[in-house]
């Protein structure tokens, strides 16, 4: 847990050093911001991309299980590092996602034409949401976890015409 906290704080410091705004430039911090085409998108604690971060956690749990349990990489006690690996991956993504290259890519190929990157508090919250997804995958049966991921993708896809699957496809191709 301490390593995960340290990684998260390092990501926050890097994002601040990259001149990302600490909070929404509107001056408020909202629990939910639902308009993906506004300047407040990806600036608050949760938004329509929160399900994607929860799904990241579920996928990272599966990756940790595969590496540490199924393949036995790292020995008997390696599985305890699953959450640390997940936080490191999510923190790395949050830093990469806020580089000019990725911000410009999002603007050019996704539905987020006005995307300007995340506020630091949003990135911090995204790491928290990913950790929640990891915890869900740890505690719930596999089929329930998969069902929740599919539901999250379908709802976000239907409501805002965007989700993790579409973002990956549009960013890569």
Model-derived segments and their meaning:
Residues 121-123:
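Active-site metal-coordination segments of metallo-dependent hydrolases
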């Amino acid at each position: 847990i301490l390593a995960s906290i340290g990684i998260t704080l390092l990501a926050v410091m890097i994002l601040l050093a990259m001149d990302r705004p600490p909070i929404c430039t509107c001056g408020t911090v909202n629990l939910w911001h639902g308009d993906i085409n506004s300047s407040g998108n990806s600036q608050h604690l949760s938004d329509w991309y929160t399900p994607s971060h929860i799904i990241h956690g579920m996928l990272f749990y599966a990756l940790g299980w595969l590496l540490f349990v199924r393949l036995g990489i790292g020995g008997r006690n390696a599985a305890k590092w699953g959450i640390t690996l997940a936080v490191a991956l999510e923190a790395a993504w949050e830093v990469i996602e806020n580089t000019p290259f990725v911000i410009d890519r999002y603007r050019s190929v996704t539905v987020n034409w006005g995307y300007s990157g995340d506020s630091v508090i949003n990135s911090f919250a995204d790491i928290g949401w990913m950790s929640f997804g990891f915890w869900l995958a740890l505690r719930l049966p596999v089929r329930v976890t998969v069902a929740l991921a599919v539901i999250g993708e379908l709802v976000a896809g239907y409501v805002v015409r965007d989700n993790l699957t579409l973002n990956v496809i549009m960013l890569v191709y």
